[in-house]
Amino acid sequence: MSTISRDSCPALRAGVRLQHDRARDQWVLLAPERVVELDDIALVVAQRYDGTQSLAEIAQTLATEFDADASEIETDVIELTTTLHQKRLLRL
């Protein structure tokens, strides 16, 4: 499995999609035979997984957008990305 760093540019794997689940009234990552519920923070990060933006760029954008500490945001973004990658939902 690839090592995730601030320079990684993740994207959703083939067959995984970001979708609003009306039954749950929640955003989810929908993968074959499984659903991963996303909280509000995970959603704004997952919406930026396009394969072109690095995690550092995503974190900086979010830090600016939410007027938050960039290093804290970057740590959280890397942690979330690592979790989703371990669940085989992302490609790097």
From Swiss-Prot:
- Biological processes per GO annotation: pyrroloquinoline quinone biosynthetic process
- The answer on whether this UniProt entry bears the keyword Chaperone reads no
Name the pathway: Cofactor biosynthesis; pyrroloquinoline quinone biosynthesis
Query: Does this UniProt record's set of keywords contain Iron?
Result: no
Superkingdom is Bacteria
* GO MF entry, a single one: quinone binding
Q: Name one Pfam family in it.
A: PqqD
**Keyword annotations of the record:** PQQ biosynthesis
Which family does the record claim for this protein? Belongs to the PqqD family.
What does this gene product do? Answer: Functions as a PqqA binding protein and presents PqqA to PqqE, in the pyrroloquinoline quinone (PQQ) biosynthetic pathway.
Record's subunit section: Monomer. Interacts with PqqE.
What is the protein's name according to its record? PqqA binding protein
Query: Origin organism of this chain?
Result: Xanthomonas campestris pv. campestris (strain B100)
